[in-house]
Amino acid sequence: MLKIGEFSKLSRLSIRQLRDLDEAGLLAPASIDAFTGYRYYSENQLPIANRIRALKEMGFTQPVIGVVLPLYGDRTAIERCLTLRRAEARMELEAAQRRLR
């Protein structure tokens, strides 16, 4: 088991992000010490943390990540989500360019 700080370094998600993800029900600690309140994560949770970090880096919001994460085994569904995110990003870019003119 890894303390939250150790898991944070390995997953490249901040401690604050890990706490937020726990509150959102996206990545709960494997266990929490009842006496100290310390959060412990399993190495088996690293792939999920990496998926979450990748989705965040692509601009997905936390609520959308909650919808996309369970679809990770379905390649077609993930491709659709990525296509939609790409279209969103394109629209955001075009709106920003219009504001600059």
Q: What are these model-predicted stretches?
A:
Residues M1-P63:
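Basic helix-turn-helix/winged-helix DNA-binding cores
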Residues R53, P70-R101:
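Short, charged amphipathic alpha-helical surface segments
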